[in-house]
Amino acid sequence: MPVHHLLICDSHENTIIERFYLTPEERRKELSSNGNSSEIRAKYMKQWKERVISLTKPTWGDAYRGIYQVATVGDKFIVHISSGKLLFIITGSEDCDDFGLKEVLETIINVFKETCYGKKNVGKMLDEEIVKKSFGKLCVGLECIIDGGIVDNLNVEFIMLQTKLKDLSKFERDFKRKYKKNH
């Protein structure tokens, strides 16, 4: 599932975290341009962010009320929702449609909440300050979810183990035990 852009901001459009992901074709073009494309890329990223904000801003009120919002630009889907004081906006295409992107956002938000507040995070609100305190772990979590623009993992328990850099054998044992129990 290709993801192109992830933006986490507040209601004043202040960027907290932003990631752009290149498609394999874009990566090849950038490598073959001998570094001449960095200015073009920076301009594109700025324009895309402005476009995403202008397209989604009219529905931020609904997103802050917990209703997922969807927009499309050509073959790209843009899905956004808030959690606490933060707005999560993701763009994807192909098999990463609005339903797939909703699932990715749910995982990202759950990883953010669990990283910032632990497992007992019901009713706790995400904001810029709490995200800054756990910024490193959150970035590792995002890399576990979206690796090089491709959705790699949506299992929150596995992602949390990765952010702690612990041995995965415990996760594998627990997963096998739960799998046998359910089947």
Residue ranges and their predicted role:
Residues 1-183:
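Acidic, low-complexity cytosolic segments
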